[in-house]
Swiss-Prot record:
The lineage of its organism: Bacteria, Pseudomonadati, Chlamydiota, Chlamydiia, Chlamydiales. This is Major outer membrane porin, serovar D. It is found in: Cell outer membrane. The gene is ompA. The keyword Protein biosynthesis does not apply. One of its GO terms (cellular component) is pore complex. Induction: In infected human monocytes transcripts are present by day 1 post-infection and have disappeared by day 3. In patients with confirmed synovial Chlamydia infections, 0/8 had detectable transcripts. In infected human Hep-2 cells, transcripts are visible from 5-48 hours post-infection. Residues 1-22 form the signal peptide. It is a multi-pass membrane protein.
Amino acid sequence: MKKLLKSVLVFAALSSASSLQALPVGNPAEPSLMIDGILWEGFGGDPCDPCATWCDAISMRVGYYGDFVFDRVLKTDVNKEFQMGAKPTTDTGNSAAPSTLTARENPAYGRHMQDAEMFTNAACMALNIWDRFDVFCTLGATSGYLKGNSASFNLVGLFGDNENQKTVKAESVPNMSFDQSVVELYTDTTFAWSVGARAALWECGCATLGASFQYAQSKPKVEELNVLCNAAEFTINKPKGYVGKEFPLDLTAGTDAATGTKDASIDYHEWQASLALSYRLNMFTPYIGVKWSRASFDADTIRIAQPKSATAIFDTTTLNPTIAGAGDVKTGAEGQLGDTMQIVSLQLNKMKSRKSCGIAVGTTIVDADKYAVTVETRLIDERAAHVNAQFRF
């Protein structure tokens, strides 16, 4: 049985190192791996010993914490209906732009994100009790990247308006939704923190069964937003938008004269519980674990308008192409720009974990019972790699 357990754990550790595929699980034996310190000798006494003191029971560890999520499995968390203009039904020619909101099927409902990445570098500090329990925290910086179908971001615009673009009515609302395009965003590097606890619950020889609980939080701002759409392609650096505002947006939306906007930021929260099993083989302690986690990315459903000129140049305020090729720049003529997209905007919808359960495999290398380096990979609910290097005082 011991040989089988060793084989399984060693295979898992080697597999993780060869295929680096949020929050790490960590080695369940970590509280008891480093039993000696670089400044003070470790204490191997019995917690029930009446002569033992808290000074004997407590120790500190510090080190580096690196967590790199290459693909988090996320989906949108939105309502089934979305308020916008009625869907166009005119066979030919233009029509008056809609001015009333209609409940339509939300194209963002249940959408899966194509890519979600997050990279964190931090310092970690752990308070150890009786070489069995850890209470730890991390303080550092994180940055992220999100990519998805334009429908996931409710990219909409007005099409077929019979008015000249210079005189779009203030009450006009979008009537077209885009689902054949891509939206991606990059966040800045911002402060991130996490707290957690880990305990070695059961030990038998070289095997250790442990559990942990962690919580992490960060709020990065959106550094760059790219909309890759044939009908309305644009890029915004440090985008701003409207929070809690229904259509129609102000006619100044997307211009430098816009008011009532705020910076686009994403409020990231995640908590995780895990259970793992390890087996010590001299310097190496491979482990395998399962985890259950929930992550959310909330941008307050901020709506961001396409950038445009505050005043018309050649009777246009954007460089959106014509759809039917019938557009013409002609002052005062009705419908001449009816086949170009008007008042284009998108919103950053709330996202959450699409899968809650995952597995983690890794190994820890311990030197002189004072220093340790852990390498881990996580699969199923995310593809991620984790590196942790620490020493005990």
